[in-house]
């Protein structure tokens, strides 16, 4: 997709273990897409802290995933998917916008903004101050 869009010179990707690898630094944007639901709360906190350290000042993280309401009973697709994660992963679940926002703030990020998407998922964007 990067080659088709002509962005291969502007976007870099890396292979690694998101649970343990150090990401280095100097990034303007880190995209975490359909990942956080596979991780426990502790693993997500650790991931976001490492992402924060990898970003330049003003750099952003974008998290795309199911975003549950605070009571975690919906939207329906995200709540049902959370059951799947609870059964099939060691600690994964769908998380609420409130939980993500708390983790992002704990890691040091500033304002958190939600971008609605068509369908059951959403995007949260936060900047490193």
For every predicted segment, state its role.
Residues 1-129:
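Alpha-helical subdomain
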């Amino acid at each position: 997709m990067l080659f088709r869009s002509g962005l291969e010179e502007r976007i870099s990707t890396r292979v690694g273990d998101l649970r343990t690898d150090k990401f280095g630094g100097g990034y303007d944007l880190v995209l975490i897409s359909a990942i956080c639901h596979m991780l426990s709360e502790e693993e997500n906190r650790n991931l976001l802290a490492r992402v924060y350290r990898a970003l330049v000042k003003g750099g952003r993280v974008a998290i795309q995933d199911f975003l549950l309401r605070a009571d975690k009973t919906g939207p329906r697709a995200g709540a049902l998917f959370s059951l799947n994660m609870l059964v099939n992963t060691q600690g994964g679940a769908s998380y609420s916008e409130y939980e993500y926002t708390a983790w992002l703030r704990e890691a040091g990020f500033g304002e958190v903004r939600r971008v609605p998407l068509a369908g059951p998922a959403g995007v949260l964007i936060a900047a490193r101050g």
